[in-house]
Amino acid sequence: MKPLSSPLQQYWQTVVERLPEPLAEESLSAQAKSVLTFSDFVQDSVIAHPEWLTELQSQPPQADEWQHYAAWLQEALSNVSDEAGLMRELRLFRRRIMVRIAWAQTLALVTEESILQQLSHLAETLIVAARDWLYDACCREWGTPCNAQGEAQPLLILGMGKLGGGELNFSSDIDLIFAWPEHGCTQGGRRELDNAQFFTRMGQRLIKVLDQPTQDGFVYRVDMRLRPFGESGPLVLSFAALEDYYQEQGRDWERYAMVKARIMGDSEGVYANELRAMLRPFVFRRYIDFSVIQSLRNMKGMIAREVRRRGLTDNIKLGAGGIREIEFIVQVFQLIRGGREPSLQSRSLLPTLSAIAALHLLSENDAEQLRVAYLFLRRLENLLQSINDEQTQTLPSDELNRARLAWAMDFADWPQLTGALTVHMTNVRRVFNELIGDDESETQEESLSEQWRELWQDALQEDDTTPVLAHLSEDDRKQVLTLIADFRKELDKRTIGPRGRQVLDHLMPHLLSDVCAREDAAVTLSRITALLVGIVTRTTYLELLSEFPAALKHLISLCAASPMIASQLARYPLLLDELLDPNTLYQPTATDAYRDELRQYLLRVPEDDEEQQLEALRQFKQAQLLRIAAADIAGTLPVMKVSDHLTWLAEAMIDAVVQQAWVQMVVRYGKPNHLNEREGRGFAVVGYGKLGGWELGYSSDLDLIFLHDCPMDAMTDGEREIDGRQFYLRLAQRIMHLFSTRTSSGILYEVDARLRPSGAAGMLVTSAEAFADYQKNEAWTWEHQALVRARVVYGDPQLTAHFDAVRREIMTLPREGKTLQTEVREMREKMRAHLGNKHRDRFDIKADEGGITDIEFITQYLVLRYAHEKPKLTRWSDNVRILELLAQNDIMEEQEAMALTRAYTTLRDELHHLALQELPGHVSEDCFTAERELVRASWQKWLVEE
């Protein structure tokens, strides 16, 4: 323990003079001298109750002793027979335990987190004990309050603020809300009372017991102003009245307050769970909610003005960088995202701050600085208050109390303490300003050119716009004005509340100043106004763009680059959330991490809620698609990587859909009993075409077939027993249903299962043996071609190995070259007649001669032709690596393979970019002439001349 500083050693002599006989100096430990010198509250208390000091020295405070508070208090109240006795015992108990907490805190015997826990638990113990004693007394006097079924009704108490969060400070008010479950009246009393009357009277008595000063002091100052309607509202409300109020009239600051609400006492009872479930939707919105930022900013502005008005300087709670700003930072994330991130729904600040860091909503460095600052400030606040058990957050101006705080905070002197304090508060202020801003940051709004506001609000004529639109052509200027006018007319048809109008009037001048600075202003504005029309009645999305200038800039650049992205954002505004973090927006998920990220994403949704699961799958896909497209546009992803990401994403989706379908089927029917003898599920999904070949585009459908290895005699082992093969058929049907069901977020993927044996006429799911037999004995050459680009995208190792063996066996069959050449060429000519040359003077990149399909047919032909001699050709299912294999195995010259690869990737890159522009896959006839000529020559060489 650090020795007392010089000023405190001098003060100790004053303390000694006050001590009574039983507390002679020589009987005191060094610890006792330190605490008595530091805290006048402890000093006064032990002078009045010397036995407390004896107890402290023989049984020092422990970190976990809060667990005994209830038992200790129960013993203290065991002989209480009237309200006066109750009040006296509660006050003495509170003072005795507060002395123990002050002792532990001054000497740093336990952590600051433990101090906060002890202070909060003490308050809860006292509140609950007082409530329970009074409830019994009131029931004896007036009867027991019951509902219509005759069930006893309890009084539930919501602890708000720091009490609710388990973070009560040393000398604090307690904010409470009283509630009771159902209407009814008392039973068993001398006269019948309505439940509302019973609980109102009981509530009044409870406040008096806790709050009224007596010769023993008070227990806690009780503040009931956070209840619905404040001081003018009923003291106690029924659950129904509470629900009505918060649904119809609950304000933003009440949501802010309710984040920390905690039910005192038995928080796991039926009524407690009912109350908690009722309040949760009000506090945590299911959708991301950015309206809270302005509300919190307004509240912070009010507090800042109050600080200035009351001349509050050196206030570690309300001042810049103080405790309140840390609380605001944490609650911004809770209120914005808490509905979708259960880890943010904690009432306590430090666990929530850890969750914020874990979700990467704040950098690790910022989160750690806030954590350290919070613990520093809370310790300083509690020490300050424990000097005199006084509710203050203002640093002292007198030398004695400054010396006390410097010593207790482990600093040599006051300047060192204030220096460290300044560092912490500066760190907090920086994070706060970056996130929430404040009145002082509104100068940007004031400095925004008045002309942009006029352009938005005053519907300027073209002549008036010259200064801001001078760089645009006359046609573009006219178009911009028309777009603004049309957008305003569209707004007049919509129901937009005053808040929505206010946000739009703030957003649009900023948006116009950014958009109209671009050369392509008219095109970009047309895409963005189309998006805005879809979200104007949903103020929370407007607020996102208004509050986060970086998000607005990303929106503008992405919409300018791609109408596909603009359409996606307009259709699914939930995706706007992705614009907030450029680190993730332009950095798609690592290719091997999609499955894990999706699994984590789905953990937020109840497994048994199919509708939410389907919605979550679609939302995840769209968010990932946006990130891939953003990286594509930014040039950070080459074409091959774009397809890799789209393919990995699809595989993650298949994995999740099969998992969902499997769980649903097993719940209904049990598992096929042959699985008892083997690992895995006996089921595989095979991807063909673009999926099999790692070549998916932005809007590609999935070519899938389903395989199982279920014996004929297998049955399921559930209560509803069905044939094992029937189980797998229903599983496949369920998978198709989950992919194609249209929710508010659209469908997941179009799935085409017609490549299965016998096509649309065949069974949806095929046994592995039947598949092998079909491929050997019935399949056409084009089906063997399709097999070149096929691979298992979901399945257990046994079935995967079986499919790979069948594929290898079929592809390595000896084939007569001329016959194969003719069959492949004729199939291609049929396709070209059916799909190609539909656009006169245009080149269809995929279907026309010299396009992508020709390259695919060349590689498929060469694999089928030569795999018998060179089995290594069967290794890969994508065209680029097949071309590499053809060169490595001396079938195609390396120069030709590389040239075809370049042509192939160039054409695919163009298809990706046309998709981003929402344009069809054809271009002018004079495009890609060199690539097409190269492909034609290769086609001639391999499929015509040989």
UniProtKB/Swiss-Prot annotation:
CDD domains reported in the protein's UniProt record: NT_GlnE_GlnD_like
UniProt-recorded Gene Ontology molecular function terms: [glutamate-ammonia-ligase] adenylyltransferase activity; [glutamine synthetase]-adenylyl-L-tyrosine phosphorylase activity; ATP binding; magnesium ion binding
Annotated signal sequence range: none
Region spans: Adenylyl removase: 1-440
Keyword Repeat on entry: no
SUPFAM superfamilies according to UniProt: Nucleotidyltransferase (SSF81301), Nucleotidyltransferase substrate binding subunit/domain (SSF81593)
Cofactor(s) the protein needs: Mg(2+)
Assigned keywords, A-Z: ATP-binding, Magnesium, Multifunctional enzyme, Nucleotide-binding, Nucleotidyltransferase, Transferase
One Pfam family linked to the record: GlnD_UR_UTase
Catalytic reaction list: [glutamine synthetase]-O(4)-(5'-adenylyl)-L-tyrosine + phosphate = [glutamine synthetase]-L-tyrosine + ADP; [glutamine synthetase]-L-tyrosine + ATP = [glutamine synthetase]-O(4)-(5'-adenylyl)-L-tyrosine + diphosphate
One GO location term (cellular component): cytosol
Gene Ontology biological-process annotations: regulation of glutamine family amino acid metabolic process
InterPro entries per UniProt: GlnE (IPR023057), GlnE_rpt_dom (IPR005190), NT_sf (IPR043519), PII_UdlTrfase/GS_AdlTrfase (IPR013546)
EC number(s) recorded for this UniProt protein: 2.7.7.89, 2.7.7.42
Region described as Adenylyl transferase: spans on this chain: 449-946
Role this protein plays: Involved in the regulation of glutamine synthetase GlnA, a key enzyme in the process to assimilate ammonia. When cellular nitrogen levels are high, the C-terminal adenylyl transferase (AT) inactivates GlnA by covalent transfer of an adenylyl group from ATP to specific tyrosine residue of GlnA, thus reducing its activity. Conversely, when nitrogen levels are low, the N-terminal adenylyl removase (AR) activates GlnA by removing the adenylyl group by phosphorolysis, increasing its activity.
The family this protein is said to belong to: Belongs to the GlnE family.
Name of this protein: Bifunctional glutamine synthetase adenylyltransferase/adenylyl-removing enzyme
Organism: Escherichia coli O17:K52:H18 (strain UMN026 / ExPEC)
